[in-house]
């Protein structure tokens, strides 16, 4: 009898064997019913379903509620809707959770997950803090801000500066409004008229204007209108016409100085680094997109509002400095730039970028300058 040789089983590649085993396991479980099948596939559920619930952030802005209705609320509402329940950002206005002066510390400690502010106002411990907010004559138009960040190295400088700070991530900087001085009873028609005026103002521009006797005063944002009414403040040097009308300060102030020492406020978004790390990539991208949307909203709101209210606004009388006084302010700003540039090599890089940008815009001519 001839022996019949049994075929020798082929050895499976370990990887292929693993795949087949997985398939057998799946088919076995599938036969147990729909409920068991659903239970066996939860490992492939979307990212958010693996969490205990939606990611929740607390974001505080430098602005009060009337202004916040334009400079950030539309963005946060849009983000929360688009996040589809995966993430919710709770929005707080100036001083609601922490005092504005404590914004940075609260962000760094994780009390806040994100902040919208400028460096100078929230006292960021970086050597470029002076450039946040209003830096005298750094800009003429709102588009100058994103152009400086994209083409003149400011983005890299900001990233470098915040890389040195634990637990804080800089996300983006955009433009706000130009800076004007609004007063209650004392019109400014010369530099001498600034002497002794107590104004609610931003740090860097306030420091520069104190050269002419202006006295910057810091109080909670919500107290400004009452302080103007009681005489605690003589005016504000904190914003442009659009904000002055929107938040009610134009109802209290009677005079507006049309000269502007800078064309746009530098405002930024920051995140607590551990909080940012917990956000999945698609929600990070969504948040950054919503920031860009907010930058665009503000650019249009301010650009249209400033011109319209200067021409059609009837709540304040416009005043202007004499040409000789204004020329002195412009000339004094050059020394102020050099003073700030000398504070650190990084600050020097920012001022060098401002000078290069200003030179380029002047050479380009109309409509740039």
Which positions does each model-derived feature cover?
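N-terminal secretory signal peptides
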Residues: 1-25
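N-terminal secretory/targeting leader peptides
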Residues: 19-21, 25-41, 46-145, 160-164, ...
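Short, solvent-exposed helix-to-loop capping segments enriched in aromatics
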Residues: 156-157
């Amino acid at each position: 009898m001839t022996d019949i040789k049994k075929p020798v089983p082929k050895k499976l590649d370990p990887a292929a064997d693993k795949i087949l085993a997985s398939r057998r396991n799946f088919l076995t479980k599938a036969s147990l019913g729909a409920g068991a099948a659903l239970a066996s596939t939860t490992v492939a559920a979307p990212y958010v379903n693996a969490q205990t619930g939606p990611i929740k952030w607390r974001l505080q802005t430098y602005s009060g509620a009337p202004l916040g209705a334009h400079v950030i609320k539309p963005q946060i509402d849009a983000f929360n809707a688009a996040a589809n329940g995966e993430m919710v950002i709770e929005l707080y206005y100036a001083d609601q959770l922490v005092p504005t002066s404590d914004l940075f510390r609260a962000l760094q400690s994780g009390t806040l997950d994100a902040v919208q502010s400028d460096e100078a106002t929230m006292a960021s411990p970086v050597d470029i803090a002076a450039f946040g907010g209003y830096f005298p004559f750094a800009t003429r138009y709102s588009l100058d801000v994103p152009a400086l960040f994209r083409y003149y190295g400011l983005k890299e400088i900001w990233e470098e500066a915040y890389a040195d700070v634990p637990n804080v991530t800089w996300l983006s900087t955009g433009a706000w409004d130009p800076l004007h001085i609004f007063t209650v009873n004392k019109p400014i028609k010369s530099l001498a008229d600034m002497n002794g005026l107590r104004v609610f103002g931003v740090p860097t521009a306030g420091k520069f204007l104190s050269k002419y006797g202006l006295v910057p005063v810091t109080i909670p944002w919500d107290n400004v209108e009452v302080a103007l009414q009681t005489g605690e403040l003589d005016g504000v040097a904190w914003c442009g016409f659009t904000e002055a009308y929107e938040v009610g300060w134009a109802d209290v102030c009677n005079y507006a100085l049309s000269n502007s020492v800078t064309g746009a406020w530098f405002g930024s978004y920051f995140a607590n680094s551990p909080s940012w790390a917990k956000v999945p990539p698609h929600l990070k991208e969504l948040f950054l997109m919503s920031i860009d949307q907010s930058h665009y909203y503000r650019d249009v709101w301010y650009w249209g509002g400033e011109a319209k209210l200067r021409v059609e606004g009837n709540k304040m009388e416009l005043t202007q400095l004499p040409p000789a006084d204004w020329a002195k302010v412009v000339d004094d700003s050059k020394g102020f730039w050099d003073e700030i540039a000398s504070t650190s090599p990084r600050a020097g890089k920012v001022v060098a970028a401002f000078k290069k940008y200003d030179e380029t815009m002047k050479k380009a001519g109309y409509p740039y300058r």
